Amino acid sequence: MSKLPRELTRDLERSLPAVASLGSSLSHSQSLSSHLLPPPEKRRAISDVRRTFCLFVTFDLLFISLLWIIELNTNTGIRKNLEQEIIQYNFKTSFFDIFVLAFFRFSGLLLGYAVLRLRHWWVIAVTTLVSSAFLIVKVILSELLSKGAFGYLLPIVSFVLAWLETWFLDFKVLPQEAEEERWYLAAQVAVARGPLLFSGALSEGQFYSPPESFAGSDNESDEEVAGKKSFSAQEREYIRQGKEATAVVDQILAQEENWKFEKNNEYGDTVYTIEVPFHGKTFILKTFLPCPAELVYQEVILQPERMVLWNKTVTACQILQRVEDNTLISYDVSAGAAGGVVSPRDFVNVRRIERRRDRYLSSGIATSHSAKPPTHKYVRGENGPGGFIVLKSASNPRVCTFVWILNTDLKGRLPRYLIHQSLAATMFEFAFHLRQRISELGARA
């Protein structure tokens, strides 16, 4: 297959709508976005990563205390040794000041990051600077080395723990909380600008559409349509899962400037990654296709069960249930990857299909269904929020941009680097087969 012509490459830039704003992406109410990312006053008082940091600070104090007690527990007795180290304190021989230093770190860090919930590094900078300076001076001027192993152990452990706390806060706590806050603000901006769903129906003569799909009136919302049919509790849960997956996909699209480039190929396909709060590393395939968006919508989104005819990365695809016009449950079996090292996996997903002014969207997430319980034949994988997006070109209806967002847990004991390599390779292979399918359909036409 030849590379993309230069003029088609230029069309790529025009075909991708501006996704820097979620205003044209989110199609959900403020209540849904708030459910995904609640406002600060309704979120947990302390994030998981901050709570882990506070536990580590507590461990610092307890560990230093334990080592000090062990040092005090000699033949002369703990009480006599305490009097000698505290009441008859001597800077050169006492370990009491190292315990006080650990308590200083404990009280200062918990006050700043647990009680006051500060989001700045200045508190830990002070505690680490004081700890480091004090320990260096004490090692130089004291006679602790004459006490044997503990003369080495306590200062070294105290120094290492202080710097581990600094690393944990600066590289884990603050960046992750800032990322979650940025996602929340992006969702709030999107909700404020309002949804832009395309409610007009496409004619059946253009391409196949599922029975009663998008058949509601122009002004009907999902809730109004759902109200006309009584859903079971499980069906309502499927609908909710589909909407939540769509909201996360919309937020990922809105963060395109934060996508991290991973690799590309000779056809112009590019794979990016992004860290999504609560879901982890997500892979994104972006490729230009020289065909109308409706054709890709037909082949990839509306008829997933026929994808096995041309997509070699999938060996089986079955629709287990159509919950309502926009929501369905699918069962997929992926082909092996990485030369057979990654064995085939099966997935059960809930999918939500939406048609908008500038794009077609199929988003999904892992779920369970009684028709396909886990079996010994395949390892049951779990997909996080992801899906297919077909972006229309504003200037040329004969071209489009295809985006595949993939967040998956393949389960099994596989090295992380191998999983990442196999996912990127699978995405490139999918794009290759999709391009071949488009060429075949074009030749038939």
Curated annotation (Swiss-Prot):
Q: Which reaction does it catalyse?
A: cholesterol(in) = cholesterol(out)
Q: What is the effect of changing Y113A?
A: Does not affect localization to late endosomes
Tissue specificity, in the record's words, reads: Expressed in retina.
User: Where does the record place the MENTAL domain?
Assistant: 46-217
SMART domains under this entry?
START
Name all START domain ranges: 230-443
Arranged from A to Z, the UniProt key words for this protein are: Endosome, Lipid transport, Lipid-binding, Membrane, Phosphoprotein, Transmembrane, Transmembrane helix, Transport
Spans within the Cytoplasmic topological domain: 1-51, 116-120, 170-445
Q: Which residues carry this modification: Phosphoserine?
A: S209
Membrane topology, record value = Multi-pass membrane protein
InterPro entries per UniProt: MENTAL, StAR-like, STARD3, STARD3_MLN64_C, START-like_dom_sf, START_lipid-bd_dom
Superkingdom of origin: Eukaryota
The conditions that induce or repress this protein are given as: Not regulated by increases in total cholesterol content, or by marked alterations in cholesterol flux.
Q: What spans does the record annotate as topological domain Extracellular, numbered to this chain? A: 73-94, 142-148
Where found, per UniProt?
Late endosome membrane
Positions of short motif FFAT: 206-212
Record Pfam families: MENTAL, START
Q: What is the effect of changing N311A?
A: Does not affect localization to late endosomes
Q: List the disulfide bonds.
A: none
Question: Which Gene Ontology molecular-function terms are recorded?
Answer: cholesterol binding; cholesterol transfer activity; protein homodimerization activity
Transmembrane parts of this sequence:
52-72, 95-115, 121-141, 149-169
> Which protein family is it in?
Belongs to the STARD3 family.
- Describe, as the record does, how this protein assembles with itself and its partners: Homodimer. Interacts (via the MENTAL domain) with STARD3NL. Interacts (via phosphorylated FFAT motif) with VAPA (via MSP domain). Interacts (via phosphorylated FFAT motif) with VAPB (via MSP domain). Interacts (via phosphorylated FFAT motif) with MOSPD2 (via MSP domain); this interaction allows enrichment of MOSPD2 around endosomes.
Provide the function of this protein: Sterol-binding protein that mediates cholesterol transport from the endoplasmic reticulum to endosomes. The sterol transport mechanism is triggered by phosphorylation of FFAT motif that leads to membrane tethering between the endoplasmic reticulum and late endosomes via interaction with VAPA and VAPB. Acts as a lipid transfer protein that redirects sterol to the endosome at the expense of the cell membrane and favors membrane formation inside endosomes. May also mediate cholesterol transport between other membranes, such as mitochondria membrane or cell membrane.
Protein name per Swiss-Prot or TrEMBL:
StAR-related lipid transfer protein 3
Q: From which source organism is this entry? A: Homo sapiens
Q: Which gene encodes it?
A: STARD3
